[in-house]
From Swiss-Prot:
<dbReference type="GO" id="GO:0046961">
    <property type="term" value="F:proton-transporting ATPase activity, rotational mechanism"/>
</dbReference>
<keyword id="KW-0406">Ion transport</keyword>
<comment type="function">
    <text>Produces ATP from ADP in the presence of a proton gradient across the membrane.</text>
</comment>
<comment type="similarity">
    <text>Belongs to the V-ATPase D subunit family.</text>
</comment>
<keyword id="KW-0375">Hydrogen ion transport</keyword>
<keyword id="KW-0813">Transport</keyword>
<protein>
    <recommendedName>
        <fullName>V-type ATP synthase subunit D</fullName>
    </recommendedName>
</protein>
<dbReference type="Pfam" id="PF01813">
    <property type="entry name" value="ATP-synt_D"/>
</dbReference>
<dbReference type="GO" id="GO:0005524">
    <property type="term" value="F:ATP binding"/>
</dbReference>
<keyword id="KW-0066">ATP synthesis</keyword>
<dbReference type="GO" id="GO:0042777">
    <property type="term" value="P:proton motive force-driven plasma membrane ATP synthesis"/>
</dbReference>
<dbReference type="GO" id="GO:0046933">
    <property type="term" value="F:proton-transporting ATP synthase activity, rotational mechanism"/>
</dbReference>
<dbReference type="InterPro" id="IPR002699">
    <property type="entry name" value="V_ATPase_D"/>
</dbReference>
Length: 208
């Protein structure tokens, strides 16, 4: 490891020791941050996988039920049933800070006033069968899970980027900056000791 190109003086030695102290403290903080990010990242990956499996399973089941329900209805009637959707939702995004990483938090709110005014479904119960109603209701209930999945996946992406940046900074301090400072400090201390011994020898020669 090449040492820093500085003059071997006591002032430089003091400055380098302060830099080493700061670098060592920063290294510990960054390692703690990296480890905590990794812990949360692993938890989110696990949640993401479980949530995705659940959603895919429920979507497949809902699609199958929808196809069966649609088969028992007139195709023109089905088109009319969904021609004018009345279910409205409002989506907004907040930002949450996790270990200095800004991640999205999705919130959704249904327009309950309009639903109460026009009915829970975009069609009349009299115009459709119960299987169709049940399928649409299940699909609506999946919205919250879908938003959570999008939230988790984006958070994982942002965390992965920050983990990589933090890892590079930790490695830079651990394998480059800190060893370089330590080697330079050791070099200056040796030079100062040599200068002190040489000065002592000169004094002894003068007094003898």
């Amino acid at each position: 490891m090449a040492r820093l190109n500085v003059k071997p003086t006591r002032m430089e030695l003091s400055n380098l020791k302060n830099r080493l102290k700061t670098a060592t403290r920063g290294h510990k903080l960054l390692k703690d941050k990296r480890d905590e990010l990794m812990r949360r990242f692993v938890d989110l990956i696990r949640e993401n996988n479980e949530l995705r499996q659940t959603i895919e399973k429920e979507l497949a089941a809902n699609m199958k039920e929808f196809v069966l329900a649609k088969a028992s209805e007139n195709s023109l009637m089905v088109e009319e049933l969904f021609a004018v959707p009345v279910h409205e939702v409002t989506l907004w995004i907040d930002i949450e800070n996790i270990m200095s990483v800004n991640v999205p938090k999705f919130h959704v709110q249904s327009n309950t006033a309009r639903e109460q005014e026009q009915g829970e479904f975009a069609y009349s119960y009299l115009s459709s069968n119960s299987e169709m109603d049940n399928t649409i209701q299940k699909t609506k209930e999946l919205l919250e899970k879908l938003l959570r999945l999008a939230e988790v996946e984006k958070t994982c992406q942002l965390m992965a980027d920050d983990i990589e940046k933090t890892r590079r900074r930790v490695n830079g301090l651990e394998y480059s900056i800190i060893p370089q400072l330590e080697e330079t400090i050791h070099y200056i201390e040796l030079k100062l000791e040599e200068a002190e011994r040489a000065s002592l020898v000169r004094i002894m020669k003068i007094t003898s």
